[in-house]
């Protein structure tokens, strides 16, 4: 798709950074015209990244899959929007076209979907992982820092399958971050313990990416139309 639309060079220039100060990456990327977008979970992190010259901020809000913050998108996006002039991308529980439309209505430039695309035919994920996403709901998400030292959202059944009690997980030492293992467990984060956002209640199948994108576009159009109708009434 990227090659057919001549977007290869565009996407090569987009760099996403996370979990460490992006200054070095910004300097390197800007030397050849690249753009850097940095993951943040609060205003303090956002201001630090902005001061380092990032081109955009990815607001990883409550309910996002994997490493995620705990702030409402309403609070974080609107506050960041009040002082940041760069690109703002919203992440967290965005699983359909209605969610995308809501993100843009709130003031985001782009909506960031992650978990929903894991449950697609092309995704390089275990079939069991995809099926677990289809069968689970928001009630099956556990927010813990045990597995990497950083708080994140994970699928409860995958934690149970690793022999752990998802309702009684200890708290890890966040100063000992380890993104390649399971932290204080024998299970490995991402390999055995699967990340997921809270929006999985909307996942009912694993279509092709093309089918999913078409569906998102249709839902986005429906949501926009409904919003415009309600706005006229108000």
PLM region spans:
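Short beta-strand/loop segments at the ligand-binding rim of alpha/beta enzyme cores
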Residues: 27-41, 83-91
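Catalytic beta/alpha-barrel core
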Residues: 12-21, 35-42, 58-60
């Amino acid at each position: 798709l990227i090659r057919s639309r001549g977007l290869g060079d565009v996407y090569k220039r987009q760099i996403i950074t996370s979990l460490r100060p992006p200054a070095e990456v910004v300097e390197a990327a800007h030397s050849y015209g690249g753009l850097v977008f940095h993951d943040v979970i609060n205003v303090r992190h956002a201001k630090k990244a902005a001061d380092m010259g990032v081109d955009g901020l990815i607001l990883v809000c409550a309910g996002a899959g994997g490493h995620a913050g705990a702030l409402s998108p309403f609070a974080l996006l609107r506050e960041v929007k009040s002082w940041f002039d760069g690109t703002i991308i919203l992440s967290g529980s965005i699983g359909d076209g209605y969610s995308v439309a809501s993100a843009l209505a709130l003031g985001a430039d782009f909506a960031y979907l992650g978990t929903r695309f894991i449950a697609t035919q092309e995704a390089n994920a275990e079939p069991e992982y995809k099926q677990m996403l289809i069968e689970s709901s928001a009630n099956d998400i556990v927010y813990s820092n045990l597995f990497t030292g950083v708080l994140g959202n994970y699928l409860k059944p995958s934690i149970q399958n690793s022999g752990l009690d998802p309702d009684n997980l200890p708290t890890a030492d966040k100063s000992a971050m380890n993104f390649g293992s399971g932290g204080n467990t024998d299970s490995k984060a991402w390999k055995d313990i699967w990340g997921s956002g809270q929006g999985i209640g909307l996942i009912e199948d694993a279509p092709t990416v093309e089918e999913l994108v078409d569906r998102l576009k249709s839902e986005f159009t429906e949501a926009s139309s409904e919003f415009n109708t309600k706005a006229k009434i108000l």
